[in-house]
């Protein structure tokens, strides 16, 4: 089938296609009623690079089924013979285009037994880098069996989910964050697939970041939403996220983590009361390497435990303050940071950050059957054995009182 053929060629297409062919495909797919005007404009306007446009285009077509994929393949074969030869494509539906599909499937291992043993249907069949959708029977079963334990989600036709990505790449006094564009593109695609309207803000000072957060918290769409995601990508220190003017010697241009929680708590953002607020942070939190050589010495590193003690003290203080309110000031939050306090996070300049890459992969593989905390735990497990560079993602400031299932596809 043409859809299976195209899945096998996806990565090669993204890396090989030119802008002229992308535009030609968009026109062809629009004329053949495969894409509507809005979908065509979204590919053109919401993606900065040719690769991003190509990725958005082929993913849209794959979701449309075999007929759409065959139109896509035929256009390439007729209008860009060099690309067709590079991809090994033929316009004949009966051709042996799918040879590499098997190779692609073989190259990636099946899901772990823990996933395959989950009750309900077998794992949905999706391409290895596509979001697996939750089968309807799983969705209905979980909603009935765990109604009192999970956060309710709104109907797709009624909800207006929003997500915000803030990414700083270029700084006045700090190094360029090469590869950050890959993180932004990957997270935007993931959150869009999960049903969120994604807003992206880049190159901001701490003051600008705070202003954008306050404006985002005030958006009326949150009233008819069931959750939100806040994603931060920047240089960072222990206390917060660096703005573009940060200087260790001079300008303390830092957005404090506390500020983020204050803006979205129940005192300041009632529209998101009792709704999951997910904070993702890709940033260093210090300068220490996240690895050490174990010896027989009884001495133990103290930085993480001292941080834990500080956190416990803050929690105790918060409980006393919260007692005077009828609702908790801070609830339904979860923060997932790319490293433990005082330690660095690693980024591949050609592939993006290790944390965001694994985060996207685990969402794609597991969010159809696992709740959010379990998905995050899968990310942590992928870092459990230190590789060339060590870091350990950390769940922090967790105040969610229920399980948050994303139910992709619903």
Curated annotation (Swiss-Prot):
Broadest EC class assigned to this enzyme: hydrolase
Coiled coil: none
EC number: 3.4.22.36
Reactions the enzyme catalyzes: Strict requirement for an Asp residue at position P1 and has a preferred cleavage sequence of Tyr-Val-Ala-Asp-|-
CDD domains according to UniProt: CARD_CASP1-like (cd08325), CASc (cd00032)
PANTHER family reported for this sequence: CASPASE RECRUITMENT DOMAIN-CONTAINING PROTEIN 18, CASPASE-1
Protein name (Swiss-Prot/TrEMBL): Caspase-1
Organism: Felis catus
Gene this protein is translated from: CASP1
């Amino acid at each position: 089938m043409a859809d299976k053929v195209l899945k096998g060629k996806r990565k090669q297409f993204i890396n090989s296609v030119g802008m002229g062919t992308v535009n030609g495909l968009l026109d062809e797919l629009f004329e053949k009623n495969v894409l509507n005007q809005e979908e065509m404009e979204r590919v053109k306007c919401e993606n900065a690079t040719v690769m991003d446009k190509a990725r958005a285009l082929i993913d849209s077509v794959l979701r449309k089924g075999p007929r759409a994929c065959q139109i896509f393949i035929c256009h390439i074969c007729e209008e860009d013979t060099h690309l067709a030869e590079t991809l090994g494509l033929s316009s004949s539906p009966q051709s042996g285009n799918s040879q590499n599909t098997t190779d692609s499937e073989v190259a990636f291992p099946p899901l772990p037994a823990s996933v395959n043993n989950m009750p309900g249907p077998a794992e949905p069949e999706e391409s290895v880098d596509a979001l697996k959708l939750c089968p309807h029977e799983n969705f209905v079963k979980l909603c009935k069996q765990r109604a009192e334990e999970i956060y309710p989600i709104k109907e797709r036709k009624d909800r207006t989910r929003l997500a915000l990505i803030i990414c700083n790449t270029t700084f006045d006094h700090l190094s360029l964050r090469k590869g950050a564009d890959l993180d932004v593109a990957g997270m935007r695609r993931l959150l869009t697939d999960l049903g969120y309207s994604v807003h992206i803000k880049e190159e901001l000072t701490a003051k600008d970041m705070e202003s954008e957060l306050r404006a985002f918290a005030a958006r009326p769409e949150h009233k008819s939403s069931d959750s939100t995601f806040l994603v931060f990508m920047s240089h960072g220190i222990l206390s917060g996220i660096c703005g573009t003017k940060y200087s260790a010697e001079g300008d303390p241009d830092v957005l404090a983590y506390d500020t983020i929680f204050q803006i979205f708590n129940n005192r300041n953002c009632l529209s998101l009361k009792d709704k999951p607020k997910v904070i993702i942070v890709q940033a260093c939190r210090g300068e220490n390497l996240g690895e050490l050589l174990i010896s027989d010495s009884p001495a133990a590193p103290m930085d993480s435990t001292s941080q834990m003690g500080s956190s416990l003290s803050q929690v105790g203080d918060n409980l006393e303050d919260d007692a005077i309110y009828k609702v908790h000031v801070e609830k339904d939050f979860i923060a997932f940071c790319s490293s433990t306090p005082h330690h660095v996070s690693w980024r591949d300049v050609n592939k993006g950050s290790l944390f965001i890459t694994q985060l996207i992969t685990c969402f794609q593989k597991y969010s159809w059957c696992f709740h959010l905390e379990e998905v995050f735990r899968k990310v942590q497990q992928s870092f459990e054995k230190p590789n060339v560079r060590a870091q350990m993602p950390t769940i922090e400031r967790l105040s969610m009182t229920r399980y948050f299932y994303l139910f992709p596809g619903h």
